[in-house]
């Protein structure tokens, strides 16, 4: 070696500055770009929080309360809890998996698992510090709630027909290639709207520019969705799952009813179904106050089960018709005329699955069908099996909702 110790120290310091400085410059440049394009709140949220978690209703977003109303409806409890042992299920991709349920549940970051048949709770367990009164985040299960509010808005006369053109309610979208898109197109997620789908292998620094991140973290969702335009695919040519559809539905309900989505949920659902606890909708921001209708409903697992029960009873609750007559079946049953190719999640379709009104359905071997409200991350599900008169709810911090749907299916189909 040659050179004085002082020169070596100076050289090491320069090298360290370069090594540490380059990532910092890149990060600051990324933050500046995102801030210019979408504002400082979005830049902060997407870069600091990045991945969505089940704590986002507390750590990221403000919320608006959804009150319940006594008396609560209480499910009967089985005298002897259901024992769930080894399960074998086939994932929609085609691979079969065998698990020992209890160890699998314990190791899966689950927070709640409930099995109900004939209005009787056969199994109810809370894990990882959660209890029955712990708040669970819906993620995309919220879409099924939003679509239900659409049906109620039709019943109340706020929406004339599902076949109405979307632009009749949102005239800002006229002349953007979306004039023929109907409210029904939104409910079945027909292609038509440009949507930048996040690839599974997307470079982490590119993720803030994809629509999934934008729809989750933007503080001004209304103004963003009113700038949408047509995509490359014609309306109805494909099934294209994305978050714009329920947000557009929510905006239509908000405009026609002159009520917030939270107030309408409270009036039409949460005070009508004997919910044991209040709930809330997460908002994009305090200033804009628009509900996260695609991903942000917060409630207890047992009350999610009651929402499932409403559909199991075809919209009737304790003798009262809550949903429009026939809505439960219309929203969840397979459509034999739906021949669309799927742009995403094709394995579900290949396994006999379908998508309708923000429910994921699957046709059984005997011709009956089950359906699920799903949310990710965390494997959130409300699984409903009409032929078995059963409901399964799972909440968690990680996991694939389609895997949990197949686990629920295996359990339910094994019940006597």
Residue map of PLM features:
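N-terminal leader/targeting segments and the immediately adjacent pre-domain N-terminus
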Residues: 2-130, 159, 188, 192, ...
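Structured C-terminal helix/loop/strand segments within mature extracytoplasmic catalytic/sensor domains
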Residues: 9, 27-45, 371-416
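Active-site-proximal loop and beta-strand segments within enzyme catalytic domains
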Residues: 102-103, 131-135, 153-239
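Catalytic-site signature segments of enzymes, centered on catalytic residues
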Residues: 132-133, 200, 207-287, 292-295
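Active-site Gly/Thr loop motif
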Residues: 275-282, 332-391
